[in-house]
Regions:
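Eukaryote-specific detector of the first structured module of a protein
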Residues: 2-60, 70
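EF-hand and EF-hand-like Ca2+-sensor regions
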Residues: 61-192
């Protein structure tokens, strides 16, 4: 149940998009994500140029998501609205078929996780991403999730490339199979 499609989409809303934790998505969340991405990628340094880049990405993402999911046009997207939109735009589709702004967000998210900028999300970066996003009592749970996520090629490489991350993200949102390795993309999930 922790890795059900419903729980995975709840996770995306709750831990990735709803930055102010008010229970719904709105433009403010995406403005905050731009600042967060700028500072995380800069490892604490602030770059006006990077902020402008992330503001563009996040505004585009908000506009696309609100077009797809704000069914009542109130400027807020509930989890139920988001799920319905993800069902229509992602279920059964490969990453390449996802909406363009969502793909830009996913690529930006990879850059934030890839702290050392080597093009690979390794075990330490995966741990750091998990521990900053969710409550973890035992780091072994995170390490086990990372191991389940990897295939033999990932292990030889020492982690996930952008292309592999995109593929797994596509499965995380677009595949209802609870046994696919992509369900571990963001660590050990719990039931909400």
């Amino acid at each position: 149940m922790a890795y059900s499609w419903d729980n995975r989409v709840d996770f995306v809303v709750r831990y990735m998009y709803d930055i102010d934790n008010n229970g719904f998505l709105d433009q403010k969340d995406f403005e905050c994500m731009a600042v967060r991405a700028c500072i995380i990628e800069g490892k604490g340094e602030f770059s006006p140029a990077k902020l402008a880049e992330y503001q563009h990405i996040m505004r585009s993402l908000w506009e696309e998501i609100s077009d797809l999911a704000d069914f009542d046009k109130d400027g807020r997207i509930s989890t139920a609205e988001f799920k319905e939109a993800v069902q229509k735009t992602c279920i059964g589709k490969k990453y390449a078929d996802f909406p363009q702004a969502m793909k830009a967000f996913i690529e930006a998210n990879f850059k934030m996780i890839d702290i050392d900028n080597d093009g690979i999300i390794g075990a330490k970066e995966y741990r750091y991403n998990c521990i900053t996003r969710i409550a973890i009592e035992d780091i072994q749970m995170v390490d086990d999730a990372f191991d389940k996520l990897l295939d033999d090629e990932d292990r030889r490489r020492g982690g996930l490339t952008l292309a592999r991350y995109q593929e797994l993200y596509g499965h995380f949102l677009g595949n209802t199979d609870e046994t696919h390795p992509g369900v571990y993309l963001f660590g050990p999930l719990s039931l909400n």
